[in-house]
Amino acid sequence: MTNFFIPPASVIGRGAVKEVGTRLKQIGAKKALIVTDAFLHSTGLSEEVAKNIREAGLDVAIFPKAQPDPADTQVHEGVDVFKQENCDALVSIGGGSSHDTAKAIGLVAANGGRINDYQGVNSVEKPVVPVVAITTTAGTGSETTSLAVITDSARKVKMPVIDEKITPTVAIVDPELMVKKPAGLTIATGMDALSHAIEAYVAKGATPVTDAFAIQAMKLINEYLPKAVANGEDIEAREAMAYAQYMAGVAFNNGGLGLVHSISHQVGGVYKLQHGICNSVNMPHVCAFNLIAKTERFAHIAELLGENVSGLSTAAAAERAIVALERYNKNFGIPSGYAEMGVKEEDIELLAKNAFEDVCTQSNPRVATVQDIAQIIKNAL
């Protein structure tokens, strides 16, 4: 039996952000708390969204304190503001950091306690505060998922919180919000989306439904990510990547992830590194480890990513997937290893132990020991 989770409503395309006030009104909201980061707030985007909400006859407050790799401290501060402002809905603006922060605020505001109490799978008892997630980057897919990743500031460990109840009520994906994003951010978020599609396609929980989303996401990313990097104002490329990251998010939300994310959660949490780049660095090494478990699928991935596999055996074609990922990293100027990013060999044991315990490890296609994971991280240095 397959369970499939997706936001009850999704609005995708140019100008979609103008739907926010109408959508909030439809779900019965009276006052929304906008959750965003300081930079997006400084651009005036949150005020534009707030204006749209007010024009729909609703009240609004703004919490512009979402941060990369959001921590429990920001979540709890947001919960306090949500309650002080007497809000009954949340609007997140940004990428995964804003969306995950809003999901976590909505969870704790409705269920009590601390976000740290909800680490793991299906630990949420009551319905959460509705979230309208407005995406400004093509990468995390967080607007589609039942996952929030929050850093435990005391333990310096990323805590995945997974529960269908935290899936946003409405996902808004507007490519016009993605134009003019710098190439570096486009690369990091685009490679994050690619990692979602690849891991979902080979995950233990993959189904024909998730396969369809993952395959189409890989096709679009292979064609349009280089174009979006080369010209951030290419609206066709931005729109294609908007759809790709949405589909990749749906795929991994229902099919699962794997060691790419288990490892990057730890590396990013300890060293405060960009999530998409952490994924990119370890992805060739994780895929090399997983090849024997999903050889035919990796052969297909190689083809989807532009490798010529004609005349090759399935095993040889599968290895071309690793070549493709290394090509992506080289072409996009991604560091060749974690050492360049400041990761220290003496931390590998702790990183591997925490990655082994990460919930994403459960859906990796090949069973891995702590020692296996340590070797993968060492290879990625």
From Swiss-Prot:
A single GO molecular function term of this UniProt record: magnesium ion binding
Major subcellular location class: cytoplasm
Regulation: Stimulated by the activator protein Act which requires the presence of magnesium ions. Inhibited by 1,10-phenanthroline.
Gene name, Swiss-Prot/TrEMBL: mdh
CDD domains: PDDH (cd08188)
Organism, scientific name: Bacillus methanolicus
Single biological process term from Gene Ontology: methanol catabolic process
Protein name: NAD-dependent methanol dehydrogenase
Reported effect, residue 97 to G: Shows an increase of the dehydrogenase activity and a decrease of the affinity for NAD and NADH. Completely insensitive to the stimulating effect of the activator protein Act. It does not bind NAD
Role: Catalyzes the oxidation of methanol to yield formaldehyde. It possesses a NADH-dependent formaldehyde reductase activity and cannot use NADP.
Catalytic reaction list: methanol + NAD(+) = formaldehyde + NADH + H(+)
